[in-house]
A protein has these predicted regions:
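Cysteine-dependent deubiquitinase/ubiquitin-like isopeptidase catalytic cores across multiple families
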Residues: 1-229
Length: 229
């Protein structure tokens, strides 16, 4: 790194080398050859990924993707913003989760413009704080990033896409920060009504609330795992 008196992020930026590659295949090969730079436990992989996607999109293009005057890629305490999440999942740094564009008092609000490869579900939608569009809810691959109160995890259907007829299907849940020692599987039954909470406090696991933004009122069972409250 450069000058040791610089803050860590500035030292990293000063030491960066950029590479322009002619195709997606060349980019995949390059990342494969340098995977350790992104995956090393004591490295700067997350920061390198953010720099890479921002420069690939182009800083001016990423800025123009965002709602006027509101967008950044990093928020308070170094948390990623919705713009950064959208940039990672769709290649465009739009500020909202709904599909397409909307106008509010003459201001253009930008949502998901292109179909993403994987989806996203948000607990905030269950609480009425945002709207997630069909492009994120129905991705081509049965994989969904799950956002619950600034924390991100993932659910996926290992057996393929859920049945179009509403039959039961199994989802796997993975949380990198949870130090899981077992596979967490949930069975979702869209055609069966959700049972009332079986504890005295009436608590509903946040993950269930989030999944029901995609499969409303579905019955959800945790199979052999304890529900995460």
């Amino acid at each position: 790194c450069a000058d040791a008196t610089l803050p860590p992020r500035r030292r990293l930026a000063a030491a960066l080398r950029t590479y322009s590659l002619p195709s997606e295949a060349a980019a995949r090969a390059f990342v494969g050859e340098h995977a350790a730079a992104f995956t090393s436990a004591d490295g700067c992989g997350v920061a390198l990924l953010v720099y890479s996607v921002a420069l690939t999109r182009g800083l001016a293009a990423a800025a123009s993707d965002m709602d006027a005057g509101t967008g950044t890629l990093l928020g308070a305490h170094g948390y990623c913003t919705q713009e950064l999440v959208n940039l990672l999942l769709t290649g465009e740094a739009h500020s909202n989760l709904f599909d397409g564009e909307r106008a509010l008092d003459g201001t253009a609000l930008r949502g998901v413009g292109r179909p993403p490869a994987v989806g996203l579900l948000a607990l905030a939608e269950a609480h009425g704080h945002c709207e997630v569009g069909s492009r994120y809810k129905s991705p081509p691959a049965p994989v969904w990033v799950v956002c619950m109160e600034s924390h991100y995890s993932v659910v996926f259907a290992a057996a393929g896409a859920p049945h179009a007829d509403g039959g039961a299907f199994e989802l796997h849940f993975y949380d990198e920060l949870a130090n899981q020692d077992e596979t967490i599987r949930l069975t979702v039954r869209p055609n069966e009504p959700a049972a009332p909470p079986d504890d005295d406090l009436g608590l509903i696991p946040p993950l269930e609330e989030t999944l029901r933004t995609r499969w409303p009122n579905a019955a959800i069972s945790w199979d052999t795992s304890e529900p995460l409250l």
